[in-house]
């Protein structure tokens, strides 16, 4: 089943634009959104297995760029990740396929 992952980041103000550009460069298949002082990355995967395959690479990338981020809290760390199963996609997307 398809999954959708949304990860929230809070770049330090002095790194905001640099972080957005780095994320866009490393994630051409993702939606990259900005809202106030946060950056949100959203991507779809065809299965949980595909999601798991990319996790190590994503964590390595995050480790290399962690210095640019503010911590949300000691418990949450530098990201707020959410993953869910896609139960329905908008008709305009499914009609294109």
Question: What is each of the regions a protein language model found here?
Answer:
Residues 3-10, 40:
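Active-site-flanking beta-strand signature of metal-NTP-handling nucleotidyl enzymes
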Residues 7-20:
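Short, surface-exposed ligand-recognition loops at beta-strand->loop->(often short) alpha-helix junctions
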Residues 9, 36, 85-88:
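Short, solvent-exposed coil/turn elements at secondary-structure transition points
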Residues 10, 45-46:
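Conserved aromatic
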Residues 24-35, 46-82:
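An amphipathic, aromatic/His-enriched active-site/gating alpha helix that lines ligand/cofactor pockets
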Residues 42-44, 95:
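Intrinsic disorder/low-complexity segments, especially N-terminal tails and targeting/processing regions
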Residues 49, 78-97:
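Short, low-order "capping/linker" segments at domain edges
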């Amino acid at each position: 089943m398809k999954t959708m992952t949304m990860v929230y980041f809070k770049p330090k103000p002095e790194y905001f634009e640099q972080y957005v550009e780095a994320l866009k460069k490393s994630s051409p298949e993702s939606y990259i959104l900005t809202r106030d002082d946060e950056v949100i990355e959203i991507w779809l995967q065809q299965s949980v297995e595909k999601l798991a395959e990319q996790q190590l690479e994503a964590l390595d990338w995050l480790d290399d760029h962690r210095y640019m981020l503010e911590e949300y809290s000691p418990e949450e760390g530098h990201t707020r990740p959410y993953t869910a199963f896609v139960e329905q996609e908008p008709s305009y997307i499914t009609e294109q396929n």
